[in-house]
């Protein structure tokens, strides 16, 4: 028995509606992959843009740190000083120049009006030739501002001991710098007698090259108003030097840890490895002295400073 015409019409209409729905479903499936590709492309573009922003910020930071420095001010109290004095401490310049013939650096130091200028070593870089004219010129200019005294760093030691540049210390002396190699220098500043101790080498050299003998020999002295101890490597102090009497220790060498991470601090130093304890700033020692570790003014490795502005240290002592 055949269906009536109305029934046939209803069946056709029903099949037509189903076909239309099937058509819509197949269109959605075709559009879904295209939508996903758009999302992937958008995510990729956002990621590339973020990388570009971060890379640009890092590059700007690196370039800034190669041409700028900051003066970091420290306050140290002394029990015996009758009048306050100011010390400028610079270290790890590594032949870098700030302005023609370091004119910007010299002008800034002159404006700070220091009573003493102390050097922490590594004004030169081992392996970069033997032309130290800019460093010697800087020393001569500094000597016109205030007495200049300092120690050698590991780069000067390598030039002296490995390359046999015996004239290096003589060049410093001719430029007006007193270089202390396990020696003491004394200065009278504003009626105060200031004793400067210069310890040579690194902590592992303490008992081998005269540093321990020197420190033992000056320990009984009390005829001074302030004693400052200089050593290039900061770990020298907690390992050995804090067993002796002085009020202020000064060191450099670490370049501020190269990279300084927000809320974490310095990333690396040669002596202490990752996350070093002594890589820039002020620290208390067991002998109640203050240790100031400068971030230094230059670089000697291919790794750039990041978030780590070079430092000129200014210490006011009262």
What is each of the regions a protein language model found here?
Residues 163-177, 189-231, 237-239, 302-305:
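Binuclear metal-dependent hydrolase catalytic cores centered on His/Asp/Glu-rich metal-binding motifs
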Residues 74-88, 177, 184-198, 222-228, ...:
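Beta-strand-turn-beta hairpins that frame and shape the catalytic cleft
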Residues 90-91, 116-122, 147-154, 180-183, ...:
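Active-site neighborhood of phospho(di)ester-bond hydrolases with catalytic His/Asp-centered motifs
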Residues 1-81:
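N-terminal membrane-anchoring alpha-helices
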Residues 93-95, 123-126, 154-158, 185-187, ...:
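Solvent-exposed loop/turn segments at secondary-structure junctions
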Residues 84-178:
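Membrane-embedded segments
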Residues 24-27, 47-70, 285-318:
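Acidic, His/Gly-rich catalytic cores of divalent-metal-dependent hydrolytic chemistry
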Residues 234-313:
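Conserved beta-sheet core of the metallophosphoesterase superfamily
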